[in-house]
Amino acid sequence: PHPPTPAINTLYLSSAASDVYKRQNSATTATIGSMMHPEMVKGGYDERFAAATAASGGVVGIIIPPSIIFIVYGFLLNLPISDLFVGGIIPGALMVIGMMVACWIVCSMNGWGHLISLSLNRVTKTAFGSWLGFFAIGLVLWGIYTGKFSPTEAAGVTVGFCMIVGLISLPLYRMLGFEGNEDKPVQDKSYAEMALVEGFTVTEIPSIVIRSAQITGILAPMIAVSVVMQQILSLLGAKETIEAFVTGMGGYYAVLFTAMAIVFVAGMVLESLPNTIILAPILAPIAHSIGVDPVHFAVIFLVGGSIGFITPPYGLNLYVASGVTGVPYFRLLRYTVPYLMSLIFVWLLVALVPELSTILLPNR
């Protein structure tokens, strides 16, 4: 016997790993969703549930370090980025586990995923074939956490590493006779074949740069508009209004949960980046004034913001998943409910147990 959800568990783990270097939830949903959705449908999953799963898989992107939103938050609030990265490790893992459990319950109740089976040979070869990707991730984390280079420098080092590996791998791939075996089943490939990536040629670099620029270009106008919007809200007295409303709630938990409610509602209509730029400078000082640890509140804030990616009426990941899977937006909405419930449970747990965000921090 085997669990009914190995394909979806694979989606969540690959989404979490992909988010580490993409650092953009919608990009992860598009990439992983387009690859995994057809396989999940073939494996006996309902297409609407598979699409909703692809959308929810990208949610953890802003929590799993290194995250660009943590960098923005740290810059806005003058907090150590390395501390924020460490603070997101356990909550990010809990989010992934929570969605896996929700998925397992739903699939068990509906009998989905019965055609998917686990193979130790396939799992070990796939894990072995991922070593270069995990090495790149480890290089980023090692460099940032040891202070060898800044997050910006880490990005440059990683790009350089991937470029070198990609350019070297293709000649080796061809020389060893592996070219043309891309569609060969994993279990039939040798470990040597799995250890190499297909790579690319120098002529493909311009298209890679263009694709990267397209993704990066999404952020610039969002930041510009968010900064202007923040200034407009400031001129209109929104900052003082929100501060007065939140602080007027009274006790510790009343203030904390009011701030969380504001973040949650804003996350329904705003992307995480403008949400952070606009609300973090307003709510963080209030949270600090009632005794909430700065790193703890940062994690609370960003976990709440991440839930907005699959929360209507905006739910950016829902639109992306609908686009890449062909499942109409309104048909996949109700299948996100189990994931929303699990994420909200984890969010409340993180808010009520500060140690989940701070236990790995030094000198705490």
Predicted features by range, described:
Residues S15-R364:
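Alpha-helical transmembrane segments of multi-pass membrane transport proteins
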Residues P1-A17, Y21:
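Single conserved hydrophobic/aromatic residue that forms the stacking wall/gate
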